[in-house]
Structures are given as structure tokens and as C-alpha cells.
């Protein structure tokens, strides 16, 4: 899986061959196909493992439950940007997945949607739990809309770590986004 993860991250789905994976992993094709029927199944398994890592990373512990939800969201997001700086293959996997989906590959597009929905549902549940007023309709956005807005901003910042911003700038940007979305603030235009 490590070799497949590396190849899919660096070369994308179409740029990665089963031959290159088995050669690098020192496996036979038969051994690979024993576990995965197709290259697409292997790709899905790699991405599902990424989803599981992300969910585990953001799952609050009992200690986290003592924090203010906004602080938890800001701190965990910032910590994740540090992870991206160390392991950029994770973000590269997602960027390749989104690009392939945008290019119209229906199978990959469907998979991208399913994986994103899985992450989104966890985010919606977290928003409902952390910010009960949103669930009761107190805000302008529904829990799903708030989760989508937060995750879209988070993904945008994530894609820029190491390219257009460093980890500290990413953390500052994330703090700004979360505080503005959750707490509001005075207008910059005023």
C-alpha cells in the first residue's frame, strides 16, 4: 500500500501502472491481484485509508471535549497543516483525485464524491455537536452548508501549504476563516 500510495500521489491514477507498483514493492502481480481485483480497487483502498487517517486525526478525544469547539477546530486544523508540510503525498493524492474527477472519468468522479461525502458527514456531525445553535437554525447556514464552507476553505488553504504559504500563514488564515464564520466580526469594507 505504501508503494501504491507513493505512485498514485506522484503520478496520478493514469500515470501509475500495476507493473511499476509490483516492481517497486517486490511483489508478483498475482499477489497484488489476490488482494485487489483491479488497479481501481487498489486506488480506492489507498484513498479509503487516507479518509480513515483524516477521520482519526480529527476525532475529538475526551480531553478535546473540554476545549471550546472553536479552539478545537482552529488547533486541529493548524496541526493538520503541519502534517501536510511533512507528508505532502496525502494532499497530492486528493489533488490528483479531484483533477481526474474534473476530467470526466465517471468511475473516479463517483469515488471522489463518495469519499468526500463520507468526510463531509463526519464534519456535519461535528458541527451539529459543537455548535448546537446552528442545528436549531440560529445561523444563516445549515449545518451542512457551514460544514461545506469550512471544508472548502480548509481544502483551499491545505492545497497551498508549501506552495503559496508556509504552515504558520496557513494557521493564521485558518484561524481567521473559522473565527469569522463562527463568531462573525466587523466588516473590512466599513
Region annotations inferred by a language model:
Residues 3-41, 45-46:
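Helix-turn-helix
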Residues 48-54:
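Short, basic, alpha-helical segments at the C-terminal edge of helix-turn-helix-like DNA-binding modules
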Residues 83-86, 100-103, 125, 129, ...:
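Amphipathic C-terminal alpha-helical segment
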Residues 12-13, 55, 59-66, 85, ...:
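Short, flexible helix-adjacent loops and helix caps
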Residues 45, 59-89, 137-150, 189-190:
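Hydrophobic alpha-helical connector segments
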Residues 59, 67, 71, 86-89, ...:
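Amphipathic alpha-helical packing segments from all-alpha helical-bundle domains
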Residues 3-10, 57-61, 93, 97, ...:
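Solvent-exposed, amphipathic alpha-helical segments
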Residues 5, 9, 44, 48, ...:
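Solvent-exposed, non-membrane alpha-helical residues enriched in polar/charged side chains
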Amino acid at each position: 500500500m505504501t508503494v501504491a500510495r507513493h505512485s498514485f500521489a506522484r503520478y496520478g491514477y493514469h500515470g501509475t501502472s500495476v507493473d511499476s507498483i509490483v516492481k517497486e514493492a517486490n511483489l508478483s502481480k498475482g499477489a497484488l491481484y489476490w488482494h485487489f481485483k483491479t488497479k481501481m480497487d487498489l486506488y480506492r483502498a489507498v484513498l479509503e485509508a487516507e479518509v480513515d487517517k483524516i477521520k482519526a486525526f480529527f476525532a475529538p478525544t475526551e480531553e478535546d471535549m473540554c476545549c471550546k469547539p472553536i479552539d478545537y477546530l482552529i488547533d486541529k486544523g493548524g496541526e493538520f497543516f503541519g502534517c501536510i508540510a511533512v507528508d505532502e503525498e496525502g494532499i497530492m493524492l486528493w489533488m490528483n483525485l479531484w483533477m481526474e474527477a474534473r476530467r470526466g472519468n465517471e468511475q473516479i468522479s463517483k469515488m471522489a464524491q463518495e469519499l468526500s461525502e463520507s468526510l463531509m458527514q463526519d464534519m456535519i456531525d461535528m458541527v451539529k455537536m459543537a455548535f448546537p445553535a446552528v442545528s436549531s437554525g440560529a445561523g444563516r447556514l445549515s449545518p451542512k452548508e457551514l460544514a461545506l464552507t469550512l471544508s472548502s476553505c480548509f481544502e483551499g488553504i491545505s492545497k497551498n501549504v508549501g506552495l503559496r504559504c508556509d504552515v504558520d500563514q496557513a494557521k493564521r488564515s485558518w484561524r481567521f476563516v473559522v473565527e469569522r464564520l463562527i463568531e462573525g466580526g466587523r466588516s473590512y469594507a466599513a
